[in-house]
Amino acid sequence: MSEQTQQQNSEEAVENVEAVETVETVGNADGVQEQAAAEPAYEDLQARIAELEAQLKDEQLRALANEQNLRRRHQQEIADTHKFAGQKFAVEMLPVKDYLEMALLDQSGNFDALKMGVQMTLNELQKAFDATQIKEINPKAGDKLDPNIHQAMQAVASEQEPNTVVGVMKKGYTLSDRVLRPAMVTVARKEA
């Protein structure tokens, strides 16, 4: 073979190798593109991870807020239970105070010693009431009737404005802010 033929064959061989490499490169590029299309991109995965982390954080915050609300509600219920724990006792003590006050109003005899003993008992009972936050509801004549703290027992014709207190039959009492017994009152009605 001549040098020229060898050189031509050599050039053709180089061209064939380059053509095969070009085809392989194009084939590999197509394969990479197909593989990339089949799998999500790294950025897409990062975005999904961030989305899931945000969702998890939101759920954690909601659970924490719910727990705090439950704890606060429970503490309030406990505080209310403590605040009104002596209510039954307080209701039972009200008639005792009423009877002692009636005994002090008795002007029939000379019972100074008895009266002094009753007064001392009443003072001690009042101290117990003060210690347990029991307060009197003792409306004055002319006060407007408040159905939350007063109970109208009788309506009488009066020159006072209707639905105002004329007199108190029995004092009312509260424990903290809760009414144990409303004040039993006589109220004014329009004169006929």
Swiss-Prot record:
Entry GO CC: cytosol
Location(s) in or outside the cell: Cytoplasm
Gene Ontology terms for molecular function: adenyl-nucleotide exchange factor activity; protein homodimerization activity; protein-folding chaperone binding; unfolded protein binding
Signal sequence extent: none
InterPro entries linked to this entry: GrpE, GrpE_coiled_coil, GrpE_head
This protein's name: Protein GrpE
Family: Belongs to the GrpE family.
Function in brief: Participates actively in the response to hyperosmotic and heat shock by preventing the aggregation of stress-denatured proteins, in association with DnaK and GrpE. It is the nucleotide exchange factor for DnaK and may function as a thermosensor. Unfolded proteins bind initially to DnaJ; upon interaction with the DnaJ-bound protein, DnaK hydrolyzes its bound ATP, resulting in the formation of a stable complex. GrpE releases ADP from DnaK; ATP binding to DnaK triggers the release of the substrate protein, thus completing the reaction cycle.
Organism: Neisseria gonorrhoeae (strain ATCC 700825 / FA 1090)
